[in-house]
Amino acid sequence: MAYITKRGSSYGVRYTYQDEQGKNCNKWESFSTKEEAINRKKQIEHELANGTFLIPSTITVKEFLMEWLPKQCNKHKWAPCTYQSNLGTVQNLIIPYIGDMQMQKLKPHHLEDLYSTLSKTPCGQYYEGKKQVLSEKQQQRFLSGTTIHEVHRLLRTAFQYAVEWGILIKSPVPVDSPKKSIQERAIWDADEMWAALASMEDPILHLAVHLTLVGALREGEVAGLTPEDLDFEGADGTGTFRINKCMQRVQKASLAKTGKDCILQEFEDKREGSTTTLVLKKTKTASSNRTIFMTAVLKEELKHWLKRLEMDEAVEPERYRNSGMLLRLPNGLAVEPILIRKKFIKWQDEHPEFTRIVFHGLRHSSATYQLMISGGDVKAVQGTTGHASANLLVNTYAHIQKDSRKKLGKKFEEGFYKPGATLVQAAPVEAEPTISVSALLELLKDADPSVKAQLRLALLT
């Protein structure tokens, strides 16, 4: 039962409920009008009777998310980078704005306000939950629609669990998600790919880019290759290489949270006190495990590279630190993805004549080119790129380039229209203005005498 009590100018609703431990708890709620108090009393009694009463909780968004995140991580066996990414979303894009709000007081409009605020927020405004001082240039680069969509996706999942856990009756996350930002990545055509590769003198960068272009690899997959992945006699002597692992640098704290089930190797730290560590891990998805066919030119480069590794080790064998990776520095240490990226950026700075792209753009360039030369054989290209589904591949590379679309339009024109045929209607010839005799006589009746005289003269001549 619930009871209404008048206190001064307000009305209170007092009731008793049982908490999670079965303990009786008294609760008092205050309202400004008697009508509000009566409605709340009816609601409480109805919910207590049918078991839908929501136990009052003061847990905040921050407290809930920081409890939910590790549980999700353990349940779904997240990789360290996945945990790191989701933790960053919570710490930098959610907690600073709604972290102190109580879960049970959160409404859909609060989240709509959050999305609106984020759309006007510069990238990197918060790092590890701490507000950063940004330069004027940095303040001009705002969070993308895709990032805000990821915030929405995480909150939608988290708040569904809040309902399951009895913290909320209904999720306050809006039904409509923020729109993703769809931006076409800059890519290279075949001529640019070949010319760029030919101009790269750094042997590590040259091989990394060559492998990426042939196999449409991710940078972590390139860095994760080992000599054992190469099979020069595979595919009847064509030569193949396997993609079954990737290299990443991860936060040690994230690694401690997620465990090491997906970790194949942890590399020695270069610096003492580092908060990150370089790891070799299983690939992103099962479909990422694949075999790539070598080209004859790549095959020769790989053979020369393996000889180079032997020569490097022979120079100072006692100081050589063999990481076991295919891409190594002269001292044997692994070449990690960020170093490949830095080498590529440096090369681009020195060669402004090429379209500026990110290193991952090489994967897009390769996949796009392979789709074009295969005549759109999505399944064959998917086998090379390692996309999780054919739909994902099609959606990612729907643009295919303007050149191929122009050619498609030309082929349509040649195949659809009959030779010499035209569908353009001729414009009607504009006839000279005419007037009937009766209409002319009517005009003459009211005409000026001088006009009548001119008309008579014109008719006679």
Language-model features, listed with the residues they occupy:
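N-terminal core-binding DNA-recognition domain of tyrosine site-specific recombinases/integrases
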Residues: Y3, Y17, P70-Y161, L333-L339, ...
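N-terminal DNA-binding module of tyrosine recombinases/phage integrases
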Residues: R7-D113, K307-N322, Y417, A421-I435
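Short, basic (Lys/Arg/His-rich) helix/loop patches that form interaction surfaces
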Residues: C123-Y127, A198, D202-L205, G215, ...
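Basic, Lys/Arg- and aromatic-enriched nucleic-acid-binding interface segment
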Residues: G124-G129, V133-G145, H149-V151, E164-P227, ...
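Catalytic-site neighborhood detector that most strongly recognizes the C-terminal catalytic loop/helix
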Residues: K179-K180, I187, K245-R249, T385-K411, ...
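Short, polar N-cap/turn motifs at the start of nucleic acid-interacting alpha helices
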Residues: D229-G237, G375-A398
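C-terminal secondary-structure termini that scaffold catalytic or DNA-interacting sites
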Residues: F232-A235, K245-N289, K410-T461
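C-terminal catalytic core of Y-nucleophile DNA break-rejoin enzymes
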Residues: R242, V250-G273, L280-H304, R321-F344
